[in-house]
């Protein structure tokens, strides 16, 4: 099936204005450059149609369903046998992805794979935007290099423990940014990393849990720019 008409969880201009405003207020006193502003592109599309799992596959689909317009990963009251991944069928390179995530219990773990590939046995290899108590906003490399950058957004007061949290991933060449609830959590220059791959949703193995994902909106080859700064300042902001 082709791309679906996009239905954003939050209007893009409002979301990015909020991101830039909050970030500026937090860091302007120490002359920290602003994160990149990504324009709302006509090419934005929904990766999930809100009704079924068309264009998504998993080694074991019994863990995955659609409930009330969200993708749900769970085994009910049973423990989850190993990490489970639901893969979107296409590969992407440079992109901006926004989505909302809700997790019960809050102490559980999940994540969003990107620039990743499935491995034999059902595991994954590649970047992960982590989800879970003590892990939200962290950039992890699944079955590879481990933690690449810990979240700058610390403290549970920045998270909605009982509801939806907004996640954004921006990958442009070797540079990666993660945004959590409108605040930048990671900015990493990673020349060793993968430059393309697939997107997948994870429910972590172990304790019974339920993770929900909705509003998955993708823009490929987004337009990058700097609000109140320049390209040199952006590079200085990235972790080396």
Predicted regions mapped to residue ranges:
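Cysteine-centered motifs
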Residues: 6-8
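Carbohydrate-interacting regions of secretory-pathway proteins
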Residues: 29-240
